Swiss-Prot record:
SUPFAM superfamilies: SecB-like
Protein name: Protein-export protein SecB
Alphabetical UniProt keywords: Chaperone, Cytoplasm, Protein transport, Translocation, Transport
Family annotation (NCBIfam families): PRK05751.1-4 (NF004393), secB (TIGR00809)
Record gene name: secB
Subunit relationships: Homotetramer, a dimer of dimers. One homotetramer interacts with 1 SecA dimer.
Superkingdom, natural source: Bacteria
Cysteines engaged in disulfide bonds, as pairs: none
Predominant location category: cytoplasm
One annotated GO biological process: protein transport
Keyword Chaperone applies: yes
GO CC terms, sorted: cytoplasm
Keyword Lipoprotein (UniProt): no
Length: 166
C-alpha cells in the first residue's frame, strides 16, 4: 500500500494585530478666562468641571482618525464666577490592522485615546499655566473601564428595548 501524505490545509493566515501612530496633532484648542483680572482678588477655592468624549472616523482601509475632546471649566466656589474654560481636541491618525468588530471598537475607544490623553493633558496644563492660574494636573483616565461601562450601557438598553417573551 502506498502511504498517503496528507497535508492539512493551512488555516487562514491571520494578520497579527498592528497599531501604528501616523500623526498626532491639535485639531482645536480654546482657552477663556472671562473674569480676569478681578478673579485674582477672590479666594481660590475652585470647583473643577471635566468632560471627556471621543470621536472616530475611518479615513481609509485600516486608517482611522481618533479625536479626544476634553473640556475643563473652573468656577470659584464662593462667587460662582468662572475662572477659566479650556477646550481641547487632541487628534491622531492611526493604522490599525489585524482586528475587527469589538476588538477594533476597543482599540479605537481605549488604546488610541490612551496615546492621545498625555498630549491633551500637557496642553491643558500649559494653557492654564499661561493664564497664570495655579497648576492643574489632570488625573489619568482609565479608558478600558470607560469602554466597558459603554458596553454595559448598550447591553442594558438593548435588553430594555427587547420585547418580553411569554
Amino acid at each position: 500500500m502506498a502511504e498517503e501524505n496528507q497535508v492539512a490545509a493551512p488555516e487562514e493566515a491571520q494578520t497579527p494585530f498592528e497599531l501604528q501612530i501616523q500623526r498626532i496633532y491639535i485639531k482645536d484648542v480654546s482657552f477663556e478666562a472671562p473674569n480676569l483680572p478681578t478673579i485674582f482678588h477672590q479666594e481660590w477655592k475652585p470647583q473643577l468641571g471635566f468632560e471627556l468624549d471621543t470621536e472616530t472616523k475611518q479615513l481609509d482601509e485600516d486608517l482611522y482618525e481618533v479625536v479626544l475632546h476634553i473640556n475643563v471649566s473652573t468656577t470659584l466656589e464662593d462667587s460662582g464666577d468662572t475662572a477659566f474654560i479650556c477646550e481641547v481636541k487632541q487628534a491622531g491618525v492611526f493604522t490599525i490592522k489585524g482586528i475587527e468588530g469589538i476588538q477594533l471598537a476597543h482599540c479605537l475607544a481605549s488604546q488610541c485615546p490612551n496615546v492621545l490623553y498625555p498630549y491633551a493633558r500637557e496642553l491643558i496644563s500649559s494653557l492654564v499655566n499661561r493664564g497664570t492660574f495655579p497648576a492643574l494636573n489632570l488625573s489619568p483616565v482609565n479608558f478600558d473601564a470607560l469602554f466597558m461601562d459603554y458596553l454595559q450601557r448598550q447591553e442594558a438598553e438593548q435588553n430594555a428595548e427587547a420585547p418580553a417573551v411569554n
